[in-house]
């Protein structure tokens, strides 16, 4: 892990207030050293402590600041309009491909900013559950905190509840899946992967900064097939044309009018 630390916003630092309970819990879990804000600027703190990344707890968000001036903070992104469409009775391609039903258990192996996870959680309803894995400690910290604290007036109560039902875990999916092998029966109905694309078609500045901390390890056929033995229904992998030619699926859905499609491997 790069050299990093966590601190408070200027307003909290000015009043000698430390990290909130949730931020402190994250710092303890990820072993992130806490430094005093002392009314200093972010650039000054990064320089003073020779940091690669500084996490700053702002109001309702945890922001990652890089040495080069870029920053990354949580936003639910496309899950906002997607959930609105679902509420209006429209279909969602991913939800349809997953084949989930109310009460199902889903494992999202690549949380990222959790746009897909939030949408899935909403579709599952309060009876369902979703666990979201993230191998990058920085992305895990920012997104995990954001899921718990995001508070934008335009978001519906149902959406905030969907965000709150997601269980984030900082772990490589290879490790987590290997541990699942020891269970007597499948723990999840559906397992989902959204590997990070090395060459995005287009992206916002927020996604660009997230990519600095992302894990680009490729999904292998071995892991894909292992996942197929650990779920009750199917494994679904989001991919863009040409990015996952090395993987073999039972079928591919989508892609006719979109650059994205989904590979499906039925449970074994």
Task: Label each residue range with its predicted role.
Residues 1-105, 114, 133-190:
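S-adenosyl-L-methionine
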């Amino acid at each position: 892990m790069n050299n990093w630390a966590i601190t408070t916003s200027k307003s909290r630092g000015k009043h000698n207030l430390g990290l909130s309970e949730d931020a402190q819990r994250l710092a303890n879990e990820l072993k992130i050293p806490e430094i005093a804000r002392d009314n200093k600027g972010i650039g000054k703190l990064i320089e003073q402590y020779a940091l690669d990344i500084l996490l700053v707890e702002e109001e309702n968000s945890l922001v990652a600041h890089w040495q080069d001036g870029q920053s990354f903070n949580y936003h639910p992104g496309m899950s906002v309009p997607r959930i609105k469409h679902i509420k209006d009775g429209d279909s969602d391609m991913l939800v349809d491909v997953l084949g989930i039903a109310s009460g199902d258990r889903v494992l999202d192996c690549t949380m990222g900013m959790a746009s897909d996870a939030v949408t899935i959680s909403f579709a599952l309803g309060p009876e369902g559950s979703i666990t979201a894995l993230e191998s990058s400690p920085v992305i895990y910290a920012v997104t995990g905190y954001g899921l718990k604290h995001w508070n934008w007036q335009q978001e519906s109560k149902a959406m905030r509840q969907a965000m709150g039902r997601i269980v984030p875990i900082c772990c490589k999916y290879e490790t987590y899946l290997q541990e699942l092998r020891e269970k007597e029966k499948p723990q999840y109905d559906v397992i989902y992967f959204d590997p990070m694309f090395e060459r995005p078609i287009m992206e916002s500045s927020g996604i660009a900064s997230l990519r600095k901390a992302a894990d680009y390890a490729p999904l292998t056929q071995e892991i894909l097939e292992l996942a197929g033995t650990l779920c009750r229904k199917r494994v679904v992998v989001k991919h863009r044309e040409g990015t996952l030619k090395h993987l073999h699926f039972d079928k591919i859905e989508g892609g006719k009018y979109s650059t994205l499609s989904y590979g499906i491997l039925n449970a074994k």
